[in-house]
Amino acid sequence: MDSEKILNPRLVSINSTSRKGMSVELPQKPPPPPSLLDRFKALLNQREDEFGGGEEVLPPSMDEIVQLYEVVLGELTFNSKPIITDLTIIAGEQREHGEGIANAICTRILEAPVEQKLPSLYLLDSIVKNIGRDYGRYFSSRLPEVFCLAYRQAHPSLHPSMRHLFGTWSSVFPPPVLRKIDMQLQLSSAANQSSVGASEPSQPTRGIHVNPKYLRRLEPSAAENNLRGINSSARVYGQNSLGGYNDFEDQLESPSSLSSTPDGFTRRSNDGANPSNQAFNYGMGRATSRDDEHMEWRRKENLGQGNDHERPRALIDAYGVDTSKHVTINKPIRDMNGMHSKMVTPWQNTEEEEFDWEDMSPTLDRSRAGEFLRSSVPALGSVRARPRVGNTSDFHLDSDIKNGVSHQLRENWSLSQNYPHTSNRVDTRAGKDLKVLASSVGLVSSNSEFGAPPFDSIQDVNSRFGRALPDGTWPHLSARGPNSLPVPSAHLHHLANPGNAMSNRLQGKPLYRPENQVSQSHLNDMTQQNQMLVNYLPSSSAMAPRPMQSLLTHVSHGYPPHGSTIRPSLSIQGGEAMHPLSSGVLSQIGASNQPPGGAFSGLIGSLMAQGLISLNNQPAGQGPLGLEFDADMLKIRNESAISALYGDLPRQCTTCGLRFKCQEEHSKHMDWHVTKNRMSKNHKQNPSRKWFVSASMWLSGAEALGAEAVPGFLPTEPTTEKKDDEDMAVPADEDQTSCALCGEPFEDFYSDETEEWMYKGAVYMNAPEESTTDMDKSQLGPIVHAKCRPESNGGDMEEGSQRKKMRS
């Protein structure tokens, strides 16, 4: 009986050698359910046992393999990454029976329910991209029929995912097959319509974290990829394919399993590869081959601006994601900041990530996912070099996004000091040009405020500004990181038209309050420097003019102008003078190789593309009215004030006259009125005093003596108010629903004042005259109608009874 006892599970961890004398056997933990790969092997072993008996067992035929594969294929009833992984491995091991397996998968897609078609298509996609070879030819014969039927039967919410899946097949299936599908389903036109209709890109689906012990990264080095390049890529039907996915049989080495069990499934490797990288990693993270990056540059030149043609392994991350809840909206490919597509490279998918880089930067979210400008990497925040274990020739950057503008700028400055070999490229990073432009307008108060290098170093950095910019274009604003300084459109208006009146205005009125005085010479220098910068702007600017003194006036009063966005960290604090752009830096910019007009044209064009500048002519806003009283100023009609008080608040309360801007605020206000009116109606208030007093009362009141500051005009004898029985109420009691005297039920109602249910016209029988708040319920007696209470209980009914009215 001792062997049948159930012990505490904590004892399982005790070493068995420490309990030799114990006769109790600990219960064993049930083994996990076998995977599909193990089940398939078990079915093969069962077949061998059935045909055993000492004779040589013949290898299974194609029909038998297909029959066993259909058994495990029936488990793919939902979008599961482990199931797709095992089915892909089985298909890779049984490549000699690939034609039958492909037909079984196509039949499964045609006959499966609607909700199970997309997981089967993902299985087809995984087999073609990871194994390739003959499977592409087997599936091509039935792909138009299978995909078109599944697309027509699928729910409309799954159509974007299926179009995205179709867009990744440009390198694994023949073009005639894809054109046939496109003609039948009109996928190109549907993708363009969805791209135009989507104002904002949808939130990208998150990848599924995989335990690193299941990952073996066998990524070839960059030098080896350059050598085999196109030779290993040209595989499928005379068109260039991505190397490393269709040459599955050419680079077989030691077998390994994704589930860490020896299953015989081979994996591609390379002698000089780093063990921390992987090439065959379908659906298990975000690793891609270097061939993807190489082919991505070339394919973007030929495939236009649609989202229908993506790299073959771009959809691997979708396996195991519920596409009915996460629908990807196809969006047009926009090269980052208008720069050439060869300058961008999909780098973020080369390592396993537990978050999406698109979530961290709005610029990345608006641009092509998986692409990034190399020149803007150091501006993303804290960037530190991480040495690699194997091949150390490649320099990888591990970027961690930090919060706060000042902290990011300090990290960038420390990077330029710690890594001298990258400091030559820092001067062209996005954000430096914006800092130069912003400082000329007066947005940056001091460099030490953000932990930036001294202003002399900025001049040294910008001395190479002209020759560092490629093709004579100014770095675009969308290439900046989170630490760059935005330039609002209102400030560009000030730069475009400073006006001649600014000098006169500066001579007449100070820029700051008296406690924050700035020297007149400093203001004049800043005016001259701003005028020098305006000379570089194109004369044919279509922006609406806005005077410079408008910005200066708003700053002098301590608030930003309407329509402009000035960060709080960039505001002028405690009398710190604005640091204008020195004339030396302007001369260095003017002496650069690039044409000045083209540089600022590119900057303005980028601002217009990002929506920061509009071509619509905006009316010039009026200046502040000031704080000094002037009778003549009151006679002038101020349209801005009238609009702010009336025009901008179209909704008005008919009861009290208050105005509101939106319907929600107006509705809340009306609800408040209804509550107040209901409370006033239920609670009858007495007047504070009588209207008039007689002459005798007036005279007697004037001669009255006492400590009161004002004589009392009302009679001194107390007057008892006549109260109605209907005004009395007590809280409802579930234990007593009828009068204790007459037996009739009480009339209950909900009181808005007390926010509880009350009995109307009811009182406590034994309630005293004083307050009953601290008294026990048993002392008050039963609840009775006020009209039923006997008058003999304590004298007169109105005087001797405590009538509980509705509490306010």
Curated annotation (Swiss-Prot):
Q: In which tissues is it expressed?
A: Expressed in embryos, seedlings, roots, leaves and flowers.
Q: Which GO terms describe its cellular component?
A: cytoplasm; nucleus
SMART domains, sorted: RPR
Q: Where is this region: Disordered?
A: 1-32, 192-212, 246-293, 785-808
Q: Which keywords does this chain's UniProt record carry?
A: Cytoplasm, Flowering, Metal-binding, mRNA processing, Nucleus, Zinc, Zinc-finger
Where does the record place Polar residues bias? 196-205, 253-263, 271-280
Q: Does the keyword Zinc apply?
A: yes
Q: Name one GO biological process term.
A: mRNA processing
Using the UniProt record, give the first listed, main subcellular location: nucleus
Question: Where do the CID domain residues begin and end?
Answer: 61-189
Q: Where are the transmembrane segments?
A: none
Q: Where is the signal peptide?
A: none
Q: Give the phenotype of cells or organisms lacking this gene.
A: Delayed flowering mediated by FLC under both long-day and short-day conditions, but normal response to vernalization treatment. Abnormal alternative polyadenylation-dependent FCA expression profile of the known transcripts. Global differentially processed (DPG) and differentially expressed (DEG) stress-associated genes due to alternative polyadenylation, splicing or transcription initiation.
CDD domains on file:
CID_Pcf11 (cd16982)
InterPro entries with a match to the protein in the record: CID_dom, ENTH_VHS, PCF11-like, Pcf11_CID, PCFS4-like, Znf_C2H2_type
Origin: domain of life: Eukaryota
The terms under GO molecular function for this entry are:
mRNA binding; RNA polymerase II complex binding; zinc ion binding
Q: Where in the cell is it found?
A: Nucleus; Cytoplasm
Which stretches are zinc fingers (C2H2-type)? Answer: 651-673
Its biological purpose? Promotes flowering by suppressing FLC-mediated inhibition of flowering through the regulation of FCA pre-mRNA alternative processing. Regulates mRNA maturation including alternative polyadenylation, splicing or transcription initiation of stress-associated genes.
Q: What is known about its subunit structure?
A: Homodimer. Forms a complex with cleavage and polyadenylation specificity factor (CPSF) subunits CPSF30, CLPS3 and PCFS1.
| Protein name, per record | Polyadenylation and cleavage factor homolog 4
What species is this protein from? Answer: Arabidopsis thaliana (Mouse-ear cress)
Q: What is the lineage of its organism?
A: Eukaryota, Viridiplantae, Streptophyta, Embryophyta, Tracheophyta
